[in-house]
C-alpha cells in the first residue's frame, strides 16, 4: 500500500494522508438534490470521486464510500408543485435518473446512499443538542438558527473572516429580524402552507440543508471521519456550516481531509441556466458516448477548472478511440490472451502520478506512452512483450474506469465511426481488396489502398497471421 498525498482544502496545500484506522478510509461526498436531471458539473464530481475510490481500492485500501441524496429542499417543493406531483414521485423519478446517468458514466455505486428524509430524527437530535449547548437558538416563528459567533473557528475551511463578511453583509445577505447575526444559518424551518413537515420540539417544520449532511455523515461514518468531498461551489457556505454545527454538537473534529472538485466552464464561461450554456448529462450523451464524457473528465486534474465544449469532447473521442484500436489490433492477433505479469515500470509511474493528489493528467500521459509501446510490440510481432503490455494497459485503464466496453461494439457505435470516418466493415472490405490486389501482383493498387487508409487515419500492419489495422497515433 503506497503512501499518497492529497490537496486538503482546509490546509490549502498537499499533505500526506494518514488514516484514522490502518488500511481503512471513510469518505462522505455530497450528492445531488434530486429535482432535475444531473448536469455535466455533477458528472465531473461523480467521475472524479469514482476514479479516486477505484485507485485507492486498487492499492489495497478498504474504502467506505457514502454519497447522500437530498430529497427535501425548497427547489424540490417548488418543482413538485409546478408539476402537480407529489414530492416522493418527483424525487424517486430523479433518483432513478441519477443512478442511470452514473452507471452510464461507469461509476461504481456508493456503499450507502442515505436520503435526507430517512434521518429526520437524527437531525432533530443534533439540533436539540446544539440548542442545549447554547450554539443554536429557536426564533419566535418556529425556525431554529445556528449562532455563528459561538463557533470560534467559523471560516477556517473557506479562509473567510466573520468580521470581514459582516462588514458587507447588508449587500450580500438578507438580514432577517429573527437572526442574531446576518450569517446565522437555519437548522430547522417552520412549517408553511402546502409544504411537507415533521413534528419537532420547535413546532412542525423541516430541516435546513446544512444539517442534513452533518446528520447523515456522522450517522453513517461516526462523529470523526477521514475524507469529506464535493464540488468547489459547496465549500462556502455548505461545508463551512457543516463543520461548525458538527463540531459544536459533538465536541470532536469533524473531518481530517477536504477534497473539492473544480468547476466546469462552457466555452470559456461559467455554466449557468441564465447564459443558456447549461447541459445535462443526457443532453451530452445524445451526441457523445458516455465513456467519452468520462474520458474528458479523467484527462484533467480534478482540481483544475475545465472548459467544456464540442471541440474538447471530439478530442476526447479521438484519444479514447486510439486505445480501443490498440486493443483491437492486439486481439486480432492474440485474442483475449493476458498474463498476470505486468510491466512494473509503467505501473510504478502510473501509481506515482495517482499518489500525487490523484494526478490523472500525468497518469494519462503514462498510458499514452504504454499504448504506443503496445502498438510497436504488436507490429514487430513480439508476442510475449505485447501480452505483458496489453495486460498492463488493461489493468491501468480499468483503474480509471476506461476502455470498459467490448472493443467491436464500441467501434461500431457512432463514436467509433465518427472518429474513424470509415466503418469496420468498410475497412475490412478495403483490406480484402488489398489482399486480392497483392495476389494478382497489382502492387501499385495494394500500395494505393494502404495510403488511402492511412490518410483516413487507419494504419495497416502485415503480420504472419494476416493484415491487422489500427488508428494512427
From Swiss-Prot:
Ranges spanned by the short sequence motif 'HIGH' region, renumbered to the chain: 32-42
Top-level taxon of the source organism: Bacteria
Binding positions (Zn(2+)): 30, 213, 238, 242
A GO-annotated cellular component: cytosol
Chain positions recorded as ATP binding sites: 273
The record's free-text note on cofactor binding: Binds 1 zinc ion per subunit.
MF terms in GO: ATP binding; cysteine-tRNA ligase activity; zinc ion binding
Subcellular location(s) per record: Cytoplasm
GO biological process, one term: cysteinyl-tRNA aminoacylation
Record motif 'KMSKS' region, residues: 270-274
Pfam families the record matches: DALR_2, tRNA-synt_1e
Family listed: Belongs to the class-I aminoacyl-tRNA synthetase family.
NCBIfam families recorded: cysS
PANTHER family in the cross-refs: CYSTEINE--TRNA LIGASE, CYTOPLASMIC (PTHR10890:SF3), CYSTEINYL-TRNA SYNTHETASE (PTHR10890)
Name used for this protein in its record: Cysteine--tRNA ligase
Organism in which the protein naturally occurs: Acinetobacter baumannii (strain SDF)
Higher taxonomy: Bacteria, Pseudomonadati, Pseudomonadota, Gammaproteobacteria, Moraxellales
Gene: cysS
